[in-house]
């Protein structure tokens, strides 16, 4: 469907202590990203939390659905996924990019200027880019279940657009090789 390289990165080790920082990054745009706050208004919120913070949201969902879980601090309580690609892919879909004054320090592009999306209005986001992210979201819903997605957003306010989503690692039965 789409040419070029896409990145699908799953993280399955978020503990309760991580949820506050994740919530701040997603909602207040405080964290490790190169945020351009002028572009934050273009971010797309597929699924937001209803409670005051991400921890309360996860706890509420688990309790409302009568899902048993270990309350130990080492328990993996949330999984995350990021869907993205390089600037070249998004440029083929019509999204404008511009060079920044920052330089790649390693990799294939070492020494080249870092490209960042050049979005000034909603009209700068082509239908094909929106459709790409809609397809990514549909794929995620199909593999983890829409009801297990706690938070999902497209971030246009960083160098390269991406979906960042978090979901509950719910399983109906445990299958282990040692029981076979």
Kindly give the residue locations of the regions a language model identified.
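N-terminal nicking endonuclease/strand-transfer module with a His-rich metal-binding environment
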Residues: 1-180
């Amino acid at each position: 469907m789409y040419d070029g390289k896409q990145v699908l990165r799953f993280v399955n080790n978020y503990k309760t202590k991580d949820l506050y920082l994740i919530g701040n990054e997603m909602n207040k745009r405080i964290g490790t990203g190169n945020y351009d706050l002028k572009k934050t208004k273009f971010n797309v919120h597929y699924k937001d939390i209803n409670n005051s913070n991400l921890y309360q949201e996860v706890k509420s969902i688990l309790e409302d659905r009568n899902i048993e879980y270990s309350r130990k601090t080492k328990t993996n309580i949330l999984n995350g996924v990021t869907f993205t690609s390089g600037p070249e892919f998004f440029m083929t879909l019509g999204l404008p990019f511009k060079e920044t004054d920052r330089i790649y320090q390693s990799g294939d592009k070492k020494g080249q200027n870092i490209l960042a999306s050049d979005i000034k209005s909603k009209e700068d986001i082509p239908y094909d880019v929106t459709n790409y992210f809609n397809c990514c979201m549909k794929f995620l819903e199909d593999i983890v279940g829409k009801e297990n997605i706690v938070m999902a957003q497209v971030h246009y306010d960083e160098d390269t657009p991406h979906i960042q989503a978090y979901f509950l690692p719910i399983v109906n039965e445990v299958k282990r090789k040692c029981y076979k």
